[in-house]
Amino acid sequence: MQNQSEKNTFSWSEFYAHRKEIRKLYPSVYKLALKKKLFDIVAAELRGKEKILDVGASTRRLGERINKKLSGVTYKTMDIDRAKKHDYYSLDEIKETFDVIVLSEVIEHISFQEGIDLLKRLATLLVSGGRLIVSTPNLHHPNRYWDSDHKTPYRYEEIAAALVSAGFNVRNIYRTYNDRYLRRFVRVYFMAWLHRYLDVDFAKSVVVVAEKP
């Protein structure tokens, strides 16, 4: 684990500068490419026989889809919930490295500083050139964030800036939204103008793909 001096190296001025740069690349949430599911993004990042770690894996649903749709991928999980079977129950137990790590709907449950520390810790579990895929509730959605156990809200430019502050290079930022065909069609192709006017978004999550240098 990181010592206190390492934790204190975070710079708010650098974070704000990173956030500004992300805003230049993606001036609004509507500039983010829309994907149906997190799995679509993860699958696009897996290159053959790679190892993936799912942090906060819960029911291992992502692994079920990977095993069904992809071949040669080694899928492992880490979750603090011992009621479910996982490969690891603490990051400190992990003594191997991975090509891809997924952190899905986890970071909003801890404080901002804990989030930065977590991102830095995950970087140590990635190979050079490894990808970290982070999803978090989309703050432009009217009610997506407001669960009682959520602690830290992140706008898309903030979660991306946090990753840069933790030493990653941001490669892509996406929104995810999936629904019944007709409802999705109407929202994506007919109601988008109204969402933009009201500054709200129907996409439930923001997903950032970042790379370890």
Where are these regions (language model features)?
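Conserved N-terminal segment of class I S-adenosyl-L-methionine
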Residues: M1-V102, Q113-K120, L125, Y156-E157, ...
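C-terminal lobe and adjacent flexible extensions of AdoMet/dcAdoMet transferase-like proteins
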Residues: V207-P213
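Conserved beta-strand signature within the Rossmann-like core of class I S-adenosyl-L-methionine
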Residues: G129-T136
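C-terminal alpha-helical "lid/dimerization" subdomain adjacent to the S-adenosyl-L-methionine
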Residues: V164-S165, V170-R183
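Hydrophobic adenine-recognition pocket in adenosine-nucleotide-binding enzymes
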Residues: V106-H109, N138
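A short acidic, helix-capping loop that chelates divalent metal ions and anchors anionic groups
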Residues: K84-H86, H141-W146
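Short "lid" loop at the C-terminus of a central beta-strand within the Rossmann-like core
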Residues: P137-H141, P153, T176-R180
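Acceptor-substrate binding/catalytic loop of class I
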Residues: N143-A162
